[in-house]
From Swiss-Prot:
The active site is at H56. One of its GO terms (molecular function) is (3R)-hydroxyacyl-[acyl-carrier-protein] dehydratase activity. Pfam families: FabA. This is 3-hydroxyacyl-[acyl-carrier-protein] dehydratase FabZ. One of its GO terms (cellular component) is cytoplasm. It is an enzyme of class 4 (lyase). Its EC number is 4.2.1.59. Involved in unsaturated fatty acids biosynthesis. Catalyzes the dehydration of short chain beta-hydroxyacyl-ACPs and long chain saturated and unsaturated beta-hydroxyacyl-ACPs. It is found in: Cytoplasm. Belongs to the thioester dehydratase family. FabZ subfamily. PANTHER family: 3-HYDROXYACYL-[ACYL-CARRIER-PROTEIN] DEHYDRATASE.
């Protein structure tokens, strides 16, 4: 699938088929590469119209770090759901269950494009571990080790 001159593996319509999140908490706009069982690269376009900017902070709007982490966790979910061929409405929910070694290196502001990079580092007994980083203009702004699981509901 092509959008403009950029390769698109999943557009927002396909992303919404896999993730239960909806506005204002859908934080992945496009997946540009996905290597099944290994890694994903995705984008989150940060607009001044994001609802959190009016309060964080009114005179110097900065994307909350917790939402950068959530964007990375959503990218991790897409990677695992696609890698494991999980069906939508399969009676399971994909949960974010842990985080280690998180670092916020630079603020993310309106107009930035977050490049979300997530790699599976381990999978054992229904628990996935990931190395994740978010970049803006080729510079790391956030990095973390994430842990997620799928559980029956």
């Amino acid at each position: 699938m092509k959008q403009g001159d950029r390769q698109t593996v999943m557009d927002i319509h396909e992303i919404l088929k896999y993730l239960p999140h909806r506005y204002p908490l859908i934080l992945v706009d496009r997946v540009v590469s996905l290597e099944s069982g290994k890694r994903i690269h995705a984008y989150k376009n940060v607009s001044i119209n994001e609802p959190y900017f009016s309060g964080h902070f009114p005179h110097h709007p900065v994307m909350p770090g917790v939402l950068i982490i959530e964007a990375l966790a959503q990218a991790a979910a897409l990677l695992t759901i696609r890698s494991e061929n999980m069906e939508k409405d399969n009676g399971q929910v994909y949960y974010f269950v842990g985080i280690d070694a998180v670092r916020f290196k630079k603020p993310v502001i309106a107009g930035d494009q977050l490049v979300l990079k997530v790699e599976i580092t381990r999978q054992l007994k229904g628990i996935w571990k990931y190395a994740a980083c978010a970049e803006v203009d080729g510079q790391v702004v956030t990095e973390a080790q994430l842990m997620c699981t799928a559980r029956a509901i």
